[in-house]
């Protein structure tokens, strides 16, 4: 389930709801519902973040999740020509994620959650496979970990102390 909100026009961040979960606690007077939401925020140019929040009302959970996502923004600088520079295999808890670069025109070949994250990051051509756990939070954390471990040619040259004349 994905909903789109553009509440902050000035910062050009787009907000998507990845997962909404309803929890029920049975009390003496009946059932008491609470909601949790996993929110993704990005500008499709390399900045993105995610937030998780709980509240007694769905709208409050979504708002709090969006605020948490804006506080958790990261920048991905190693996106060259709409794809990633190299293959990466990352795992977080039980979720394992494989990202492979693709030729221009391929598009995003991935599952729904990973596709949304890659779109919001600004990736145009990539092949991704989610292995292991289907837990949404672990998949999102694995995707962020994979995108942050990417390094472009210049970064590798700097680490190896290769001077380009």
Curated annotation (Swiss-Prot):
GO terms for molecular function: rRNA binding; structural constituent of ribosome. GO terms for cellular component: cytosolic small ribosomal subunit. Residues 13-76 form the S5 DRBM domain. SUPFAM superfamilies: dsRNA-binding domain-like, Ribosomal protein S5 domain 2-like. Keywords: Ribonucleoprotein, Ribosomal protein, RNA-binding, rRNA-binding. Pfam families: Ribosomal_S5 (PF00333), Ribosomal_S5_C (PF03719). GO terms for biological process: translation. Belongs to the universal ribosomal protein uS5 family. The N-terminal domain interacts with the head of the 30S subunit; the C-terminal domain interacts with the body and contacts protein S4. The interaction surface between S4 and S5 is involved in control of translational fidelity. With S4 and S12 plays an important role in translational accuracy. Located at the back of the 30S subunit body where it stabilizes the conformation of the head with respect to the body. This is Small ribosomal subunit protein uS5. It comes from Chlamydia trachomatis serovar D (strain ATCC VR-885 / DSM 19411 / UW-3/Cx).
């Amino acid at each position: 389930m994905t909903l789109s909100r553009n509440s902050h026009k000035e910062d050009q961040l787009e907000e998507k709801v990845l997962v909404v979960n309803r929890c029920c606690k049975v009390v003496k007077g009946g059932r008491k519902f609470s909601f949790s939401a996993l929110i993704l925020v990005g500008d499709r140019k390399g900045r993105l973040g995610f937030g998780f929040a709980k509240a007694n009302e769905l709208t409050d959970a979504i708002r709090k999740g969006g605020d948490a996502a804006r506080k958790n923004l990261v920048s991905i600088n190693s996106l060259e020509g709409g794809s990633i520079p190299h293959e990466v295999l990352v795992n977080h808890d039980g979720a394992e994620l494989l990202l492979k670069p693709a030729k221009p025109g391929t598009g995003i070949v991935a599952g729904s959650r990973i596709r949304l994250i890659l779109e919001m990051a600004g990736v145009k051509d990539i092949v991704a496979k989610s292995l292991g756990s289907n837990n949404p939070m672990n998949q999102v954390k694995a995707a962020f970990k994979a995108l942050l471990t990417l390094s472009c040619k210049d970064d590798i040259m700097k680490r190896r102390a290769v001077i380009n004349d």
